[in-house]
Amino acid sequence: IVYDKKTAKSAGSFIWDNEVGGMFIVTATAFKNTNADSLLEDITRIVDSFGKEPVTDKELEKVKNSVENDYINNMQTIMGKADALASFWTFHKNTGLINTMVDEYLSITKEDILKAAKKYLTRDNRVVITYLPKNGKEN
């Protein structure tokens, strides 16, 4: 939607994990001439594809490299280590995961991702929020 269709000037996603539950959040900023409903259709098509076909080997390798790099960089500071220990205690009651969690992430397979996407990334399991300019006009 950013590089090929050019319906959004920016797009991204992230996971917001919480103690009781979490969210997978997708954001996109439309170009002035892009209709919000059209952009939502494009995003929906992309998210729906996660549950239909496995990610490619290249995509999985890219994500694993990013996870490992982020984890190593985060462990370079006392604050990063403290935050990781606090998170592991809050979510798992196990600070020892600081030594093994990155390996668990790196062991995830394409099939694991496909199974999770089919379970959690369904149309019935989402909330859509659209922010429009102050004047209320999409274009």
Spans of model-derived segments:
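In a subset of proteins, long, contiguous C-terminal domains/tails are tracked
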Residues: 107-139
